[in-house]
Amino acid sequence: MRAHFGGSSRKSLVASRVSLDAAVKGADANSASALSSELFFVADVLSTNIAVRRALTDPSRDGKAKAAFISDLLGKKIGALALGLVTELSSLRWSSPKDLVLVVEQLAIEAEASAANIAGELDRVEDEIFTAATAFAGSSELRKALTSDATNAKAILVADILKGASGSTVKLVSQMVNAWRGRSIESAFADYQWALAARRNRLIALVRIAAPLSQAQLDRLTTSLTSKVGQPVRINIEIDPSVLGGVSVKFADEMVDGSVSNRLAGAARALAGSK
């Protein structure tokens, strides 16, 4: 789980996810999946090269020098979007160089989750990952096979076990079994499930309103929020008589507030602050 991140890395994770939001906004499923693949590649590079990790997380190193280093190292191997994200991450502060690896990996998982969401398959992917986690953790033979160094054999095994699963599921599990990063099977699956859930929560809007919406109103709201996010969103409606008018929308970590009650409360706070 990502809850172990320290202060600097925790703040940088938040900023990194905002950058990913912008990167996948309006993207199609193929583009989001391609970004995911490139970020997984970067995570592997960072994981296997401590000198690169330190170079990108050294707070005393000039930002322009880091950007030039990243361009020289990765410019011909990944696209401009992924390159820009990695450059942004290098400008943030990290409690530990290893945290950068984990955050890049999380962004890769979330980018693939975005691809699945765009394709209408995120629910399916989450279910399949949960099922795979249960199956793999419960079989000593599978555990032994998947933690071996035989990369090709693991790829064949995963493809066979996940036959009929979503392409995103196969991709995520294949990536995971070839990059345990010192984790147990249970911990690795927990990290992947956490990242999938984090992206899912980013795409859920809680709407508080005094009276039920008509289907036409709900459709307009869905269209509006989808346009704002640049991806399909799920809307959960909560009827709250205390909302005097308009609508209050909690989306991700942001409030989009059009309710009379909250506008009045906001005005009252502003008046109180001006005294």
Task: Describe every region a protein language model picked out.
Residues 1-244, 248-250, 254, 259-275:
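Elongated, mostly alpha-helical coiled-coil "stalk/stator" tethers of large membrane protein machines
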